[in-house]
Curated annotation (Swiss-Prot):
Matching InterPro entries: ARM-like, ARM-type_fold, CND3, Cnd3_C
Organism: Homo sapiens (Human)
Post-translational modifications: Phosphorylated by CDK1. Its phosphorylation, as well as that of NCAPD2 and NCAPH subunits, activates the condensin complex and is required for chromosome condensation.
Bias-annotated ranges (Basic and acidic residues): 974-988
Protein name: Condensin complex subunit 3
Length: 1015
């Protein structure tokens, strides 16, 4: 009898399992003992399922329910432990199969709770089974099929549990595995971020699924991106990814807007890859291909520097030759980049890093000689080496190392005069070298100009370098004049005759034994011989002279223009164009515009644009030249010219560039009586401005994405700065943003996506520009032919965007001051335009779009009377039932607002007769009553002022706006009796104790269900 008392009933086990501190392992053992004593296991199965049903109808994640589910899964799978007998496994496995059968029959129930609990239980059962557990193939197939169906459930939580349940049923080695295919679809297309996170945590990495996992690092939700980096760090080896994938992951993660994602990248993925590289930072850099992704590599190094002691970082650069320099023969791209990045990092640490910086950097004098020797060692590409890719690759590697060595100059201490002069001299010497690679010129000039502060000194030095490069001193031989040659020949003949005569006289003297005379003749003969030899040498040798020879080859012009461009970029605008600079313009820049080499023309256009920023007259003089380049040259040069034109328009405005200028005559005795002539000049000027803007705006339709983006950015800047006001161009920008053709233009989409709200909410004038663009934009979309990409754009979505951008409540606080002085808002004017458009074409297909936009407007009470007249006319002409219902609601709302406005006006008049005690309160109420409709809507509309689409998607959820309109209607219906107050003022925050008490009350106790009799 004692043994029977110790047997635990199923009901009691379920009751005890709810308790938070209950030892579930003991409960499992106790209930297992009861199970073994029963002869008829079917009774146990049915009773177990009966009590389990009570928890399966609860959707909320109650702690008691979760504990019971956990207990049930542990108990059922406890019979599959490895130490059980084989016959027991077969016998006791019946409970698991029975439970699976029941769950699989219930997975299609109408109740969300039941479907959720079925998937949860299957997930728990499969997860609690040991590694070597086996189930029937038939049961496996049924579970697989049922959970694949539940992956398409309408409830996200059900889909999540189905994803988790299928994790042990996937076969990553099978390319046709249905589970893997379903995961690959869900991870990209499921609308719920938690479902995508669940798939990320379950999907097994393989060659097929790796791109899907990597793609989630671009997910719109921060939590998904964060988990994606964690999964990649834990489950994917670095070698499994290509270099492009590694660089892309690091670039995105380190530049992510979310700090949590950045931390996940640095803490998990970056540290994991460093462990794969055995802690060797240089080896990690080698696996990132630093030559082609130096910016990403520098970001990686800075992230690693921030978590590594400075003494440890400096250790990698201490393998020097005693001069604090890394030997040239041991320099690699990774070491050079590490050295440069570390120097910049230590420089940024101030006094703390200065001590360590001195350990890895020498004095400027020593470093200057080191840099010069390395640059001189870079080989030159000859014609025979142009086809040798290994030679070219080695040359590019050396150039990359040279770039890093040049960048290290930023970290040198140039405060000492001697070191600074030496460094400047070496930089100038390097720039003059004929073998200097062009890729290093801009880096060298930038460092040179950084050391020199004075603009005039900069101009002087750069001009000298340009002169040395373009017109170097060369020694040449000069042919003598024919007359001089003739004179030398005559002199040579004369010397020869004298030699003959002297030799004959010498023989006679010897014969006569006149030795004194003979010695004199010998000396004379020697002098004549010397004269003959010298004259012979002069005749044979050409005259050598040092002359300046001007070079006009493409490489020389490119170097000179780079020098000029870097100088112009560094010069202050207030400096202007000096005489020296004008000389460079005439001799170098303007001839470069017509060069046959595209690289030279592009640099010349860049220089011309920078010169225009220095002087307005110069800009006006050469503006037409830039326009010509913009129309006829290559794409790259067109882009440079387009940017230069927009820069000059931003600096000086459109006025200086009108070809026809009104010249007011101030001469005595001259009167301007010809008004017609002045008007014609103004018309010509206006036409000129329009032609320029038309030329620029036409590039919005260019097939070249860079030209489209440049034109859109430039026009957006002009509009935002107030230099351009054009609803037509604004309409084209909106259409360009939505156009599916620009879907891949990330920079264009991002630029316009930021521009629209900032521009619209800056002032009422800008909102009026959007108001004017409203109807033309929608009409363009409505009239677009089926073959046009514009036909794919959702007109309703565009209308919602424009309505939100013109909301009076969205204006900046500074801009709202001007709004208060005007009776009608932008939405009021827009409402009138929409109503008139509906009356113009009451049967148009766009009537529903207009009606929906009309119902979303924030209308003031001042407009109610006039708008009601138009609405009555519209109701008589429009036949569409959907539109009629929406218009009726608008009419009712306006009638209420009109009535309230009249009552409030009377109340305001009565308020002026009250005592001074209540005067301030009455004035406050009067302000609230002035625009009751706008007052209620303003607070609720503030949440919907964001853009309705960021990437031109066709369908957009509009539930937020629907809820806002519902709340507005409710507020308006109650405003007859009380003053409408902002919704935010009615919210109260409950104290922590009240929240705790409410939570305790909400906890579900299953005892009342378990006490019911079995049916």
């Amino acid at each position: 009898m004692g043994a029977e008392r110790r047997l635990l009933s199923i009901k009691e086990a379920f009751r005890l399992a709810q308790q938070p501190h209950q030892n579930q392992a003991k409960l499992v053992v106790a209930l297992s003992r009861t199970y073994r004593t029963m002869d008829d296991k079917t009774v146990f199965h049915e009773e177990f399922i009966h009590y389990l049903k009570y928890v399966m109808v609860v959707y909320k994640r109650e702690p008691a329910v979760e504990r019971v589910i956990e207990f049930a899964a542990k108990f059922v799978t406890s019979f599959h432990q490895s130490d059980m007998e084989d016959d027991e496994e077969e016998e006791d496995g019946g409970l698991l199969n029975y439970l699976f059968t029941f769950l699989l029959k219930s997975h299609e129930a109408n109740s969300n709770a039941v479907r959720f609990r079925v998937c949860l239980l299957i997930n728990k059962l499969l997860g609690s089974m040991p590694e070597n557990a086996q189930i029937d193939d038939d049961v496996f197939d049924k579970i697989n099929k049922a959970m694949l169906i539940r992956l398409k459930d309408k409830i996200p939580n059900v889909r999540i549990q189905a994803v988790l349940a299928l994790s042990r049923l996937q076969d990553p080695k099978d390319d046709e595995c249905p589970v893997v295919n379903a995961y690959a679809t869900l991870i990209e297309n499921d609308s719920n971020p938690e479902v995508r996170r669940a798939v990320l945590s379950c999907i097994a990495p393989s060659a097929k699924t790796l791109p899907k996992i990597v793609g989630r690092t671009k997910d719109v939700k921060e939590a998904v991106r964060k988990l994606a980096y964690q999964v990649l760090a834990e489950k994917v080896h670095m070698r499994a990814m290509s270099i492009a994938q590694r660089v892309m992951l690091l670039q995105q993660g380190l530049n992510d807007r979310s700090d949590a994602v950045k931390q996940a990248m640095q803490k998990h993925l970056l540290q994991g890859w460093l462990r794969f590289s055995e802690g060797n930072i240089l080896e990690l850099l080698h696996r990132l291909d630093v030559e082609n992704s130096s910016e990403v590599a520098v970001s990686v190094l800075n992230a690693l520097f921030s978590i590594t002691p400075l003494s440890e970082l400096v250790g990698l650069c201490k393998n020097n030759d005693g001069r604090k320099l890394i030997p040239v023969e041991t320099l690699t791209p990774e070491i050079a980049l590490y050295w440069c990045a570390l120097c910049e990092y230590l420089k940024s640490k101030g006094d703390e890093g200065e001590e360590f910086l001195e350990q890895i950097l020498p004095e400027p004098v020593v470093y200057a000689d080191y840099l010069l020797s390395y640059i001189q060692s870079i080989p030159v590409v000859n014609e025979e080496h142009r086809g040798d890719f290994s030679y070219i690759g080695n040359l590019m590697t050396k150039e990359f190392i040279g770039q890093q060595l040049i960048l290290i100059i930023k970290s040198l201490d140039t405060s000492e005069e001697g070191g600074r002069k030496k460094l400047l001299a070496v930089l100038q010497e390097i720039l003059i070298l004929p073998t200097i690679p062009i890729s290093l010129v801009s880096f060298l000039v930038e460092r040179l100009l950084h050391i020199i502060i004075d603009d005039n000194k900069r101009t002087q030095i750069v001009t000298e370098i340009i002169s040395e490069i373009r017109a170097p001193i060369v020694t040449v031989g000069v042919n003598n004049d024919p007359a001089d040659v003739r004179k030398k020949e005559l002199k040579m003949a004369e010397i020869k005759v004298k030699l003959i005569e002297a030799k004959e006289a010498l023989e006679n003297c010897i014969t006569l034994q006149d030795f004194n005379r003979a010695s004199e003749l010998k000396e004379e003969i020697k002098a004549l011989e010397d004269a003959r030899i010298n004259l012979l040498k002069e005749t044979e040798q050409l005259e050598i002279k040092e002359v300046h020879i001007e070079k006009n080859d493409a490489e020389t012009l490119q170097k000179c223009l780079i020098l000029c461009y870097e100088l112009l970029k560094q010069m202050s605008i207030s400096t202007g164009l000096s005489a020296t600079m004008n000389g460079i313009i005439e001799s170098l820049i303007l001839p470069g515009i017509i060069s046959i080499h595209p690289v030279v023309r592009n640099l010349a256009v860049l220089c011309l644009g920078c010169c225009g920023l220095q002087n307005q007259d110069f800009a006006r003089k050469h503006f037409v030249l830039l326009l010509q380049v913009l129309q006829i040259d290559d794409v790259t040069i067109k882009i440079s010219a387009l940017k230069a034109i927009f820069d000059q328009l931003m600096t000086f405005g459109i006025e200086p560039f009108k070809t026809k200028k009104i010249k007011t005559l101030h001469c005595e005795g001259t009167e301007i009586n010809s008004d017609d002539e002045q008007e014609s000049k103004e018309v010509e000027e206006t036409a000129t401005a329009k032609n320029v803007l038309k030329l620029l705006s036409d590039f919005l339709d260019s097939e070249v994405s860079e030209l489209r983006t440049g034109a859109a950015e430039g026009l957006a800047k002009l509009m935002f700065s107030g230099l351009l006001v054009s609803s037509r161009i604004l309409s084209r920008l909106i259409l360009l943003w939505y156009n599916p053709v620009t879907e891949e233009d990330v920079q264009l989409r991002h630029c316009l996506g930021v521009f629209f709200p900032v521009f619209a909410y800056a002032s009422r004038t800008n909102q009026e520009c959007f108001e004017e663009a409203f109807l033309p934009t929608l009409q363009t979309l409505a009239n677009a032919p089926a073959s046009s990409p514009l036909a794919e754009i959702d007109i309703t979505n565009v209308a919602e965007l424009l309505v939100d951008l013109t909301r009076p409540s969205g204006l900046n606080p500074q801009a709202k001051t001007s709004q208060d002085y005007q009776a009608l808002t932008v939405h009021d004017n827009l409402a009138m335009k929409i109503c008139n458009e509906i009356l113009t074409s009451p049967c148009s297909p766009e009537i529903r779009v207009y009606t929906k936009a009309l119902s979303s407007l924030e209308l003031s009470s001042h407009l109610a009377k006039d708008l009601l007249v138009l609405l009555n006319e519209i109701l008589e002409q429009v036949k569409d039932r959907t539109c009629l219902r929406a218009l009726e609601k608008i009419k009712i709302q306006l009638e209420k607002g009109n009535k309230e406005f009249g009552d409030q006006a009377e109340a305001a008049q009565d308020a002026t007769l009250t005592t001074t005690t209540f005067q301030n309160e009455d004035e406050k109420n009067k302000e609230v009553y002035m625009t009751p409709l706008r007052g209620v809507k303003a607070t609720q509309a503030s949440k919907s002022t964001q853009l309705k689409t960021n990437r031109g998607q066709r369908k957009v959820t509009v539930s937020a706006r629907t809820n806002r309109r519902c709340q507005t209607a409710e507020a308006d219906s109650e405003s007859d009796h009380e003053v409408p107050e902002p919704e935010s003022e009615m919210k109260m925050r409950l104290p922590r104790r009240a929240k705790t008490a409410a939570l305790e009350k909400s906890k579900l106790n299953l005892a009342q269900f378990l006490n019911e009799d079995l049916s």
